[in-house]
Every structure is written in structure tokens, then in C-alpha cells.
């Protein structure tokens, strides 16, 4: 019999995953009565901004709601000791594999926060993606040459040292990155087709092996998107630093220390000691 906490975790995660899909795939219920009435009202008084604002408000609300749900699910995963870094993914029940997605879903939703400081958003999103990629590597779901690291937005004076270093672009590295991106694109295309077929099989009945295959392929699809997102976020860090330098007029000035962060990534605690020191969910 399923334990109450297991059932609660399952329900919270599935609801959050459905909400994430709704947000990212644009499956907003535009046919809903409330939204239709709002659009008709706007068209009647010729104010086109009303439906746009209304839709954006709904999306922002859903993003924040999904983040809170996923953070709760992360705490429950830690509480239930579902993961240990000494395990292999084959040792886990098929139904537990989906919880690998917690940090990557949080990372994706974090990038969609529009009311927070962008530097905080970019840094915290990277923490989530790295946590996801590292766990997938630890459990041998994928083999990566190296797991990307978090690139932080540097203080005004910290970037000068790097700016002095200049030279020709690393063409070999650029070609390797381009080839990697193309390979991931092709693999993702195949994974989407495989997932579609597996989903059809699951609709006919819950077979343990099919469930396992579905979640493994879904995780691999998110691994590919995470690697692409990490590359994009690193570029955004460079852009944020460049913009900060432009605003400062390229003059070194003393800046006030950063205020305490409002965003704190909640990741899965792996062992008892971490829980005692940091709590059930803690920022890395």
C-alpha cells in the first residue's frame, strides 16, 4: 500500500509537471470562458493591451505556483530518502525516476521569472541545471565528458582581469560545440518520437518496463535541453556584465555589496548529514 507521503509527493509532482507542460508548450486554455469574455470586452472598447496583460498575468501566476509545488516536492524527496549518490538508476523503481526532473523543471521555470533581479535568476537557474546534470551522471543515466559549472555575474571590478586576455577565437572549440548541439538536436527529435510511442503504450496499461523507458528517455531529452540552456545562460552572464560596464561608463567605481538574495534554489539532500546541517532542501 502506498504511504501517505509517497502519494502526496506523486500528486504534487504530477500536478507540477502538467503545469510546467502547460506553461512551456503554450497549452494555455485560451478557450476558457473567463479569457473569452476578457478578449471580447477588450475588442469592444478597442483596448488590445487588456487581453495581453491578462494572459501574461495568468502565465506569471502559473510559473510561481509551479515553482512552489516543485520546491515542496523536492523537500518530500529529501524527506523520503529516494536518492542516494551511491546508487545506479536501475536500482530505483520506475515511478521514482521522474523525480530526477525536479531541478531541471525548477531551472526552466526560474528563467521565466520576470519580476526578480536577472542576475539572481540566471545564477539560480544554472544551479538547478548543474544539479540535474550531475545527478544524471552520478546515476549513469547519461555519460558527459564534463558537467558544466555555474558562471556567476561578477562584481564590477572582478571582470577586468578577464578583459585583458584577448586572442583569436578557439575555432576547434566552436566547431565542437556546434557539432554537439546538432547531435543533441537530432537525438532530441528521435527521443520525442520514442516518447510519443511510449505514451501510447502507457495509455493501454501501466507496464513497469515501459514506465522506466518513458522516464529515462524523458530525462535524456531534458539533459539535452539543459546543456543548451547552460550555454545560453553563460552567454547571458557575459551580456549582463557588459551592460553593467556600459552603465558604469567603463569607469571603475566602488559599488555597494549585493543585497541578500531573495531566490534560493532548493535541491535534493543526498544524505543524513546534509539534512542535519542544511535542512531538507538547501541552496548549493
In which residue ranges do the predicted regions lie?
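Internal amphipathic alpha-helical repeat/solenoid segments
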Residues: 2-46, 52-96
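Surface-exposed beta-strand-to-loop junctions
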Residues: 15-23, 105-108, 169-170
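Conserved small-residue packing positions in alpha-helical repeats and bundles
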Residues: 16, 102-109, 179, 186, ...
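Short amphipathic alpha-helices and their capping/turn residues within compact interaction modules
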Residues: 21, 25-28, 75-82, 109-116, ...
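Extended low-complexity, polyampholyte segments enriched in Ser/Thr/Pro and acidic residues
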Residues: 22, 29-41, 58, 140-284
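Elongated alpha-helical scaffolds
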Residues: 91-113, 127
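Extracellular glycan-interaction surfaces
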Residues: 118-120
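TPR/TPR-like (Sel1-like) alpha-helical repeat modules
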Residues: 123-138
